[in-house]
């Protein structure tokens, strides 16, 4: 039960990277929010780099806190909420808001990455030493399943419908994602 619960974090969390970082919002940012695809791709890359640098510098400190044990759960929840709330703000960005959208993306991506630090810190405590690799792979595979399900739902309900879902106008940000 504990291993399944731990794995479900990946199932629920992986759609962020699938939808926001890789397929849907990244395309929307580079092709609709940014003035052109070249500037959009450049700025998106800058956002990824900022996230990577921040995570590289702060992860050792956060990892030490996670290893202490007492902060693991509260910081997992904290960083997860940072990701969730920042991702919600992405919904409200539209054409021309290149820096606002990039700001919320970077904050959300940092929240995602730092949440992963604390999720991963649980693994040695829930898995026997000889099964850590197998259990880690189980979580990883459930993450991919979650990401694929979220991608299919997004494509069929939001990106490619002939009639917009939830009565959203066809040119609203959620239905204006180029694929």
Each model region followed by its residue ranges:
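Glycine-rich segments within core transmembrane alpha-helices of 12-TM secondary carriers
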Residues: 113, 133-159
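Transmembrane alpha-helix termini and helix-breaking/packing motifs in multi-pass membrane transporters
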Residues: 22-33, 147-179
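Hydrophobic core of transmembrane alpha-helices in multi-pass small-molecule transporters
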Residues: 80-118, 122
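Helix-loop boundary and gating motifs at the non-cytosolic
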Residues: 1-52, 98-102
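Cytoplasmic membrane-interface "Motif A"-like loop-to-helix N-cap segments
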Residues: 66-82
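Central cavity-lining transmembrane alpha-helices of secondary-active solute carriers
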Residues: 20, 24, 41-65, 85-86, ...
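Loop-to-transmembrane helix entry/capping segments in MFS-fold secondary transporters
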Residues: 38-42, 129-140
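Helix-to-coil boundary motifs at intracellular loop junctions of multi-pass secondary transporters
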Residues: 32, 68-69, 122-126
């Amino acid at each position: 039960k504990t291993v399944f619960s731990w794995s479900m974090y990946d199932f629920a969390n992986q759609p962020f990277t699938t939808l926001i970082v890789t397929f849907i919002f990244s395309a929307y940012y580079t092709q609709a929010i940014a003035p052109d695809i070249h500037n959009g791709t450049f700025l998106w890359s800058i956002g990824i780099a900022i996230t990577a640098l921040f995570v590289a510098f702060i992860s050792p400190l956060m990892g030490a806190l996670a290893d202490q044990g007492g902060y693991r759960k509260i910081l997992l929840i904290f960083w997860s909420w940072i990701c969730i709330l920042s991702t919600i703000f992405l919904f409200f960005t539209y054409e021309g808001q290149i820096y606002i959208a990039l700001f919320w993306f970077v904050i959300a991506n940092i929240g995602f990455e730092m949440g992963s630090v604390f999720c991963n810190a649980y693994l040695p405590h829930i898995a026997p030493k000889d099964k850590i690799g197998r259990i880690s792979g189980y979580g990883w595979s459930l993450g991919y399943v979650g990401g694929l399900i979220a991608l299919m739902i997004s494509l069929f309900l939001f990106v490619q419908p002939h009639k917009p879902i939830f009565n959203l106008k066809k040119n609203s940000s959620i239905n204006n994602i180029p694929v």
